[in-house]
Amino acid sequence: MRGILCLLYNPPVPTHPFDRYAAFTDLSVLKAASDRPLRKSVRVNTLKCSVADFKAWAQEQGWSLTPVPWWPEGFYVDRTDLSTALGRDLRHLLGHFYMQEAASMLPVALLDPAPGEAILDLCAAPGSKTTQIAARIGLRTKDLGLKDLKHAPLASDDACLGVVIANDMQEKRLRVLNDALQRTGATSVVITRKVGQWFSKHLTERFDRVVCDAPCTAQGTARKDPTALQYSSQDSIEKAARLQYQLLEAAIHAAKVGGRIVYSTCTLTPEENEGVVLQILNKFSDQLEVIHPKEALPSGLNWDTSAAISDSEIVQKSLNPNPNPNLHPFLRLWPQTYDTEGFFCAVLKKTKPTRAVEPLEMFPRAARLLSRKNAEAVSRLFTEQFGTDFLQDDECLVEKGNFILLAGEKAHAFPLPVTEYAMGIPFAKILPDGRYRITNELASLRGHLASSHVLELMEEQLHGLLAGKDIPVDSALRGDTILRHRGISLGVGLSKEGTLLNRLPRWVVKLGS
């Protein structure tokens, strides 16, 4: 099949990487669209902020919001005041919203994850899709109501906080991923560092849903990075397609029977998109079905997918020698069609086993469950100090090094034949004398629950803290103090003898630089 695809799609050597697409779309329109600046778009992080609150706040800022049609928490943003970069906005740095290209929200929309499920993000860094999944499965049943879910979880137990296994290979990218998860308050995520193909054998049929947003030649990102087209040699394309095939196959093996797999790239080449999926369907013709995007998307969305499906069908015809080929409802987003990056998605359902399931070889966990005695001590301390222990029913405390971590129970209990790279968010730091100190990550996520040891900041105090300064406070205020401004929890400081020592995280303090 691979050889057939290469022979069928053999355009002349182009002078521009897009010239090879002349048979698929209007080149002048494609090139003009790719030269236009990319529209700014954001996704509301519902772990920290409701869509209604975000929209009200954005209106106060004078922002104009246009909904992203395929994700209810996604918005295009138009601002008249451009004096502050969107990425330096305080709410962004605190994780209330995430800067994410609109097309990049589509794979998780098609995945349509639900609370209680086990999800694999096979190529997770830098974290946009992982944080998007974590926010969706972090919505409790009591918040959503099962009647509001398009599907009940495939998992046997009821819809509580699920688990996301976020995998990547590169250390630098993993650090960026971990920072994003801590900033957004994603307690349900376990990070692993493995080649994607490892999941085929070691975690066969373990996941309700798998997203494979594969490494690619990234032609679709030319609107924000013109240098992306430098990596479009035929050798680069074919090398990427070989890896993508292996990763998609691993994703299929890792999915449970009945599970959903979403394959996506941010490139335009047929070899890396339709070509890869058609090869997979040829190999697993009896074990896979293609799901129509309309069936895959969350309920209540009325996005018209017909143009994207039609554009993919045109490409599929070029890859198939049959005069009447069986065409599949894949999604091809040319930059000009929806005014986005170039993107591709396909949704598959696993209907039968694809390989034998082998016994799990378990490894000791790097983070161990906190003893009942210590967990009660932390809970008692925080309740006395802040009026709440900040815990929810389906969460647990685990100990790793000199930190106590807050994690979903499913995240900690998920059987992994590997030592996790990271899990949950920092809950408390264990001081040398054995005392516990609340973390900025916890204060930012749950500080709104506190009823004592809270300082409501005035504008002048806020500006001083963001500039990295300590500020004067009432001498009656002592110890760890949660800092809030207009209902938003920023982090913590230490009140001592009439001074609040600034202990805000580096990504917040940098606002004042």
Regions found by a protein language model. Name each.
Residues 43-105:
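Conserved AdoMet
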Residues 169-202:
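S-adenosyl-L-methionine
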Residues 116-123:
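Conserved class I S-adenosyl-L-methionine
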Residues 255-256:
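Helix-to-beta-strand junctions that scaffold the AdoMet/dcAdoMet cofactor pocket
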Residues 70, 267-399, 491, 506:
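C-terminal catalytic and target-recognition region of SAM-dependent MTase-like enzymes
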Residues 8-24, 30-61, 341-344, 351-513:
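Polybasic, low-complexity RNA-engagement segments
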